[in-house]
């Protein structure tokens, strides 16, 4: 039959690229699970009363090429002015070797958080390097890797200061008046829910204030002044006040380490180590503290440990501090960090080394000195005598200066009274400085760079002698070897080879949605039109961003059934926090601020109680019944008991147990009946899109994990984006911003992120995904995700019982395999199975969540039947191995499972095991072999012998 032109054009071609199983494979799986079609399967599984009659109207699909052309036209509306705004954001030069081999490399950006250290040694090493950079530059003992942005790090520093403070009755936090305004904004938001009073004043007046538990100072103030706080910090320490210092990572190359001056906590943004501004993010924040406070630190800490053979190996240390274990008692609700961006920054430091970094920092400072000398020579006054890269220039005709700057396509900082701010960076050239002279002085200034350079080279007093660094930095060999591109390329490849990412195998982590991150989706993030914009540039210069964000928000509104979307939160946990704050402020607006009880099912993700606690709520746990569903009787009892104090419920749908609960609407009705709001966690949105929606179900607010459902890659543990969708009554209470008015938002609430649109530069990924899939493709993706999960469940059911099922024995988009009976019978645990899967070439499913002793599997729609069968065959082969242990063919203490994973060096060592080398490393005929580089980690050793900086290079070899 002859095809029509429309059929030949095939605008939906990407749908088939994104969805792994083709039509024939889908039919084979449907036959295996006993369903006639995708629609029939969905109809059996999803409760009838929440199924959408028609899919959301987000348009028809577009090809990869058409979508890229459309987005390129939108991006071209952004105006790329040269930015001197500063305020914590500068232009950068990302080394091409890092751009090509990391940022554009799926071996780096598709990996997951390194909870399985045996398959994560490469990025763990890069993160350990990031911690070493932080330790060397801050002068402190312990560093994490990493936090979401500088402002979030400031809020975490405040919370940590209160945790460790010996002044238990003090409830005031002092912030120096010259911190960045966005930092103060986020600190105030966090302080409100904790009940802290924030005092903002000149730093030298801090001692005038009583009952202060912590102080936040900024080493280089927001308008550029370098502060020597040595004496002040000493006085504050004598009064037992915890001192936090915000620092500029590039300035720290030249300036005294705040830790050496006595600071307890030092943090800042690592953005200017190679990460583009990207209209606000994503960027990694560094965070360091004194050793005595290490167990109170937020964020992930990479530690050096040993594997089962005694070899040096890396792991995430002290995880008992984190939300997935401590829940509401966690130090922070942070789940996502900024691993990909932290690794870019760490490799930037590796590539340039201490000599290269000093040259870059000195060049920036020299150009700033030259600019300052020329302006002063012509009679302009600088507000500060001591500076690194930022001048605050007093100008009589400010309007005229700004007009000339705009004509020259230059952005200066304009919010300073009777002055302009100018921040230089590593991209600044001689020509740029001459252009700045013309803007500030007129074209006939008569200044010459070389003449000015001679003057300042002999007489630069802009950094106080006491503030000049006198110690060596980055002395570890890793920072002093890889300076040629060949060496750097090979080093990065050696790290990449140690890790398991989606470019090698499926990553079946339940509750994580490790789906395809398509190349076409990733291409726009490095376009200069998106990468080079400052988040505080004038809005008329960001019309492309505004259009793209507005379109994406409109699509998300339609897909979620909500009325508005706020793009600011830059992680799922931050989205939870923002959504709960919206609920809190909504209640307060109705004079019901006493509503502070948050109901959370026992099965909830650890971020839920941690976020509720951070939002100033009390957590009350609701029981689950024997089928894993919310116990309605217990829910009613807890809601009635809370009464007028009920704030909300946090519920995940489909449930964390991998089932579409039949009573979800009734759950919403019960909570609404008692005046509460419904927060529907968007973690499992991949089983809703196009089929149902949170708004249609009856929820009031949700966060969306764009790094799960909408294809932003996990990056080895970040970046992420967690925008929140809200019903109209909550829209006035979503986060605002103190620097930038967010168009269309009437909100006056405080910010939760440093930038108004969070990690804006990765939003094009989700825009591309929705545009290329269209309504038809998005629904089909959800349906195939459900099909793939049910196919795995049905084929593994006899070997590994599925713990929870819904109607007709079906699961949603993930399933929980119960290992407890096997462990009781044979002694083989879920940990043993997880590690043995590595020998078969797979990342393990999620272990012991949400139920201890289980494995939760989520295949996503992107995996083909071939890959699903490979995983199933591996699991069945492992079950046969367990039977060998059960039959005493292999002893419990010496078998392929308890000894897994196996590494190459074992093949040439003495072999005393009761199974062959072939069984160990090529089980069941595994051909495309992934080789882990370490054996099973010794977690106890790692936490008892905490070591979180770089080890001798010989230990890596």
From Swiss-Prot:
Recorded superkingdom: Bacteria
EC number: 1.4.4.2
Cofactor: pyridoxal 5'-phosphate
One of the GO BP terms on file: glycine decarboxylation via glycine cleavage system
GO terms for cellular component: cytosol; glycine cleavage complex
Keywords: Oxidoreductase, Pyridoxal phosphate
This protein's record includes keyword Nucleotide-binding: no
Entry keyword Oxidoreductase: yes
Modified residues (N6-(pyridoxal phosphate)lysine): 708
Top-level enzyme category: oxidoreductase
Catalytic activity: N(6)-[(R)-lipoyl]-L-lysyl-[glycine-cleavage complex H protein] + glycine + H(+) = N(6)-[(R)-S(8)-aminomethyldihydrolipoyl]-L-lysyl-[glycine-cleavage complex H protein] + CO2
Record-level Gene Ontology MF annotations: glycine binding; glycine dehydrogenase (decarboxylating) activity; pyridoxal phosphate binding
Quaternary organization: The glycine cleavage system is composed of four proteins: P, T, L and H.
Listed HAMAP family: GcvP
Family: Belongs to the GcvP family.
Function as written in the Swiss-Prot or TrEMBL entry: The glycine cleavage system catalyzes the degradation of glycine. The P protein binds the alpha-amino group of glycine through its pyridoxal phosphate cofactor; CO(2) is released and the remaining methylamine moiety is then transferred to the lipoamide cofactor of the H protein.
UniProt-recorded name of the protein: Glycine dehydrogenase (decarboxylating)
Species classification: Bacteria, Pseudomonadati, Pseudomonadota, Gammaproteobacteria, Enterobacterales
Name of encoding gene: gcvP
């Amino acid at each position: 039959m002859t095809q029509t032109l429309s059929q030949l054009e095939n605008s939906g071609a990407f749908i088939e690229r994104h969805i792994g199983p083709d039509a024939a494979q889908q039919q084979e799986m449907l036959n295996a699970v006993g369903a006639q079609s995708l629609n029939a399967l969905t109809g059996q599984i999803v409760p009838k009363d929440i199924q959408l009659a028609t899919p959301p109207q987000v348009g028809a699909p577009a090809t990869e090429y058409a979508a890229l052309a459309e987005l390129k036209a939108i991006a071209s509306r952004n105006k790329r002015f040269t930015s001197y705004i500063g305020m914590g954001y500068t232009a950068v030069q990302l080394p091409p070797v890092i751009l090509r081999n990391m940022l554009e490399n799926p071996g780096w950006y598709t990996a997951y958080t390194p909870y399985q250290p045996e398959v994560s040694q490469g990025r763990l090493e890069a993160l350990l390097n990031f911690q070493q950079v932080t330790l060397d530059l801050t002068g402190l003992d312990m560093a994490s890797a990493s936090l979401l942005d500088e402002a979030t790090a400031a809020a975490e520093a405040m919370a940590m200061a209160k945790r460790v403070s010996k002044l238990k009755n003090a409830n005031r936090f002092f912030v120096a008046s010259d911190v960045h305004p966005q930092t103060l904004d986020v600190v105030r938001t966090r302080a409100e829910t904790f009940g802290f009073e924030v005092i903002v004043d000149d730093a030298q007046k801090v001692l005038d204030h009583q009952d202060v538990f912590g102080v936040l100072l900024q080493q280089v103030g927001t308008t550029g002044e370098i502060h020597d706080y040595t004496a002040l910090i000493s006085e504050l320490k004598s009064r037992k006040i915890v001192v936090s210092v915000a620092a500029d990572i590039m300035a720290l190359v030249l300036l005294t380490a705040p830790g050496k001056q006595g600071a307890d906590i030092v943090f800042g943004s690592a953005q200017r180590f190679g990460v583009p501004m990207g209209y606000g993010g994503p960027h990694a924040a560094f965070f360091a503290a004194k050793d005595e406070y290490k167990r109170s630190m937020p964020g992930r800490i990479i530690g050096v440990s040993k594997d089962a053979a005694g070899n040096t190996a890396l792991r995430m240390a002290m995880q008992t501090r984190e939300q997935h274990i401590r829940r509401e008692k966690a130090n922070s609700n942070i789940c996502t960090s900024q691993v990909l961006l932290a690794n870019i920054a760490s490799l930037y430091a590796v590539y340039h080394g201490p000599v290269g970094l000093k040259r870059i920092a000195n060049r920036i400072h020299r150009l700033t000195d030259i600019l300052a000398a020329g302006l002063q020579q012509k009679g302009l006054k600088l507000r500060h005598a001591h500076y690194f890269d930022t001048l605050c220039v007093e100008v009589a005709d400010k309007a005229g200066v700004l007009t000339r700057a705009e004509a020259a396509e230059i952005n200066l900082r304009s919010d300073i009274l009777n002055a302009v701010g100018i921040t230089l960076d590593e991209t600044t050239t001689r020509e740029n400085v001459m252009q700045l002279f013309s803007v500030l002085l007129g074209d006939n200034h008569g200044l010459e760079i070389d003449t000015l350079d001679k003057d300042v080279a002999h007489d630069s007093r802009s950094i106080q002698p006491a503030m000049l660094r006198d110690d060596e930095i980055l002395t570890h060999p890793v920072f002093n070897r890889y300076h040629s591109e060949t060496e750097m390329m090979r080093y990065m490849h050696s790290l990449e080879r140690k890790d398991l990412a989606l470019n090698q195998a499926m990553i079946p982590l339940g509750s994580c949605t490790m789906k395809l991150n398509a190349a076409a989706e990733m291409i726009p993030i490095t376009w200069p039109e998106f990468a080079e914009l400052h988040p505080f540039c004038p809005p008329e210069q960001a019309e492309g961003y505004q259009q793209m964000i507005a379109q994406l928000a409109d699509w998300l509104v339609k897909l979620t059934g909500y009325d508005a979307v706020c793009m600011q939160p830059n992680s799922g946990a931050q989205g939870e926090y923002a959504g709960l704050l919206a609920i809190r402020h909504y209640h307060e607006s109705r004079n019901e601020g006493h509503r502070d009880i948050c109901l959370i099912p026992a099965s909830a993700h650890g971020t839920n109680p941690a976020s509720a606690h951070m939002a100033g709520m009390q957590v009350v746990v609701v029981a689950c019944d024997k089928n894993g569903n919310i116990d309605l009787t217990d829910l009613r009892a807890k809601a009635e008991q809370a009464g007028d104090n009920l704030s909300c419920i946090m519920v995940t749908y489909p449930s964390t147990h991998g089932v579409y609960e039949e009573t979800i609407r009734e759950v919403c009705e019960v909570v609404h009946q008692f005046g509460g709001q419904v927060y529907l966690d968007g973690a499992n949105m991949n089983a809703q899109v196009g089929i149902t929606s949170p708004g249609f179900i009856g929820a009031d607010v949700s966060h969306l994990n764009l790094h799960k459902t909408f294809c932003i890659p996990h990056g080895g543990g970040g970046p992420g984006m967690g925008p929140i969708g809200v019903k109209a009554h909550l829209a006035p209470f979503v986060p605002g911003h103190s620097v930038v008015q967010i168009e269309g938002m009437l909100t006056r609430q405080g910010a939760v992120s440093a930038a108004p649109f969070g990690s804006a530069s990765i939003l094009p990924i989700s825009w591309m995904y929705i545009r290329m899939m269209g309504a038809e493709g998005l629904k089909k993706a959800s349906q195939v995700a459900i099909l793939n999960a049910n196919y795995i469940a049905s084929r593994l059911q006899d070997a590994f019982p599925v713990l929870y099922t819904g109607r007709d024995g079906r699961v949603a988009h993930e399933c929980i395999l119960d290992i407890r009976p096997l462990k009781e019978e044979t002694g083989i645990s879920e940990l043993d199975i997880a590690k043995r899967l590595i020998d078969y070439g797979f990342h393990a499913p999620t272990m012991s969540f949400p139920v201890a002793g289980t494995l939760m599997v989520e295949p996503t729609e992107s995996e083909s039947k071939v890959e699903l069968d490979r995983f199933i065959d591996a699991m069945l082969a492992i079950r046969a191995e367990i039977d060998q242990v059960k039959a005493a063919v292999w002893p419990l203490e010496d078998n392929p499972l308890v000894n897994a994973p196996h590494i190459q060096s074992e093949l040439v060592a003495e072999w005393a095991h009761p199974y062959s080398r072939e069984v160990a490393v090529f089980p069941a005929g595994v051909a495309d072999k992934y080789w882990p580089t370490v054996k099973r980690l010794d977690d106890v050793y790692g936490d008892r012998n905490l070591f979180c900086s770089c080890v001798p290079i010989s230990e890596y070899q």
